A protein has these predicted regions:
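Intrinsically disordered, low-complexity regulatory segments enriched in Ser/Thr/Pro
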Residues: 32-59, 146-171
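Short glycine-rich, low-complexity/disordered patches
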Residues: 24-25, 69-78, 109-132, 188-205
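Alpha-helical oligomerization segments
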Residues: 150-205
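N-terminal ordered "arm"
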Residues: 1-42
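Negatively charged, low-complexity tracts enriched in Asp/Glu with abundant Ser/Thr
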Residues: 1-17, 83-129
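Aromatic- and glycine-enriched beta-alpha-beta binding-site module
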Residues: 36-39, 44-94
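Conserved binding-pocket/active-site segment within a compact domain
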Residues: 110-171
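Short amphipathic alpha-helical segments
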Residues: 50-54, 103, 107, 111, ...
Length: 205
C-alpha cells in the first residue's frame, strides 16, 4: 500500500471517528496539529505540512486512541512477538537495528546522549545501559544496549508495551521504530523523508 492510499484511508477513518475538528499530537519533541476538515497535519509552530509518512503514522496513532484508548498493560515485548513479526523482522533489522548497532559500535556516547538529553529518555535497569523513551503520549519504548568488547559485537534490544499492538499494525510499529532510529541517530525525520530516502525502506503502511 502506498503512502497516498494509506493517508486517504486514514483521513476517511478520522473523519468518521473524530468528535473534534482539530487534534494536537506530540511525537518525540515535535508538536503536530491534525486539522480534520482540511485533511492536513501541520508542524507547530512553523505551520509546515508534515510529510505523508509522518502524517500517516500520526493519524494511525490518533485512530487507535479514538477507537481503543491506550492503557499500558505493563508487559514489555519485542518486535518478533507481534503478529507477523518474524516475517517482517529482516526488513526491521535492516532499517532499524543495524543503523543503531553501527552507531553503538562507533560512538556510543553520542547515541546515549541523544536519547537522554535531546529526547528526554531516562536511564533504567538492563543490559550495559538502558534508556526508556516516550514517543507518543504514554507510548514508552525501551532500548537495551550491550557495548562491544574484544569478543562480542554490540547488541540492542528494543521493547515496547504489548498495548501498542492494539493501536498500530506490525508494519506501523516497524515504521515507528525506523523513525525513532532516524531521529536519535542525529538526523531530521522530516529532512530525511523530504529527500525521498524512504524509497529504500522495505516496509510500508
Amino acid at each position: 500500500m502506498t503512502y497516498e492510499i494509506a493517508l486517504n484511508k486514514a483521513w476517511d477513518e478520522i473523519v468518521a471517528l473524530s468528535p473534534s475538528q482539530k487534534h494536537t499530537v506530540k511525537f518525540l519533541t515535535d508538536i503536530y496539529e491534525v486539522q480534520v476538515i482540511d485533511r492536513i497535519v501541520l508542524m507547530r509552530p512553523s505551520d509546515s505540512p508534515a510529510s505523508e509518512e509522518i502524517s500517516v503514522l500520526i493519524l494511525r496513532y490518533l485512530i487507535g486512541i479514538l477507537k481503543h484508548g491506550y492503557n499500558q498493560k505493563g508487559e514489555w515485548i519485542s518486535f518478533k512477538e507481534l503478529k507477523g513479526g518474524p516475517s517482517y523482522y529482516p526488513a526491521y533489522q535492516k532499517n532499524t537495528i543495524k543503523p543503531i548497532l553501527k552507531s553503538l559500535g562507533e560512538d556510543p556516547d553520542s547515541l546515549i546522549k541523544n536519547l537522554t538529553g535531546r529526547f528526554g529518555g531516562k536511564l533504567v535497569e538492563g543490559g550495559d545501559i538502558s534508556v526508556e523513551l516516550v514517543t507518543f503520549p504514554d507510548v514508552h519504548v525501551k532500548f537495551i544496549f550491550w557495548f562491544a568488547d574484544k569478543e562480542l559485537p554490540p547488541e540492542v534490544t528494543i521493547l515496547f508495551d504489548r498495548e501498542l499492538a492494539e493501536i498500530f499494525t506490525t508494519e506501523e510499529v516497524a515504521t515507528l521504530m525506523f523513525f525513532l532510529a532516524i531521529a536519535f541517530l542525529g538526523n531530521s525525520v522530516e529532512g530525511v523523508l523530504k529527500f525521498n530516502l524512504t524509497s529504500t525502506i522495505d516496509i510500508g503502511l
